[in-house]
Amino acid sequence: MNAIEAKKAKTTLVVGVEKMTDVSSERVGDILLGASYRPEEGDTKGGFTGVFATIAKSYFQKYGDKSDILAKIAAKNHENGCANPFAHMQKKLDFEFCNSVSEKNPYVAEPLRRTDCSMVSDGAAALIIQDIDIALSAKRAIAFRSRRHVNDILPLSKREKTEFEGARLSLIHI
């Protein structure tokens, strides 16, 4: 976007790829933990899922157990996936299944069950960004309302676990 705004490019291709299925579960866990603050969260039981479990526990302590809400979200997401021919997971899982701990839906890192967590899989996405004059001549185009880059404090010990200040800040100027 910077290159287009500076008139150094008229069209750009942005590509993102993630290949996770060719490495061991241990390696995947280590890669994902790279998105946390390793000096403090590197040994968290359950790995990166354990970091989110810590956040969920703090949220439940503050607002009450909301496991049923997580199950409703999981069931809704699976239902939406069934309606999307491009969705990775196209299997309907009902609320009762998502809200129960079982052999097929165990705790990954309590209180998070398998249906509360994303799958380890491969994926890719691409986006073409164009100068407004070129984009307006296309049959289908979108415009960005805003663009924002913010940082958040990574160590959970240095912030309120139930708040994501970076996400909040990113919405200020929309």
Task: Report each predicted region and the residues it spans.
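Active-site-proximal alpha-helical scaffold in enzymes
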Residues: 1-18, 50-84, 127-133
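Conserved catalytic cysteine-centered active-site region
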Residues: 1-11, 19-51, 90-119, 150-152, ...
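Acyl-CoA/ACP chain-elongation machinery
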Residues: 16-17, 22-24, 28, 74-88, ...
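Conserved small/polar residues in nucleotide/adenosyl-binding loops
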Residues: 172-174
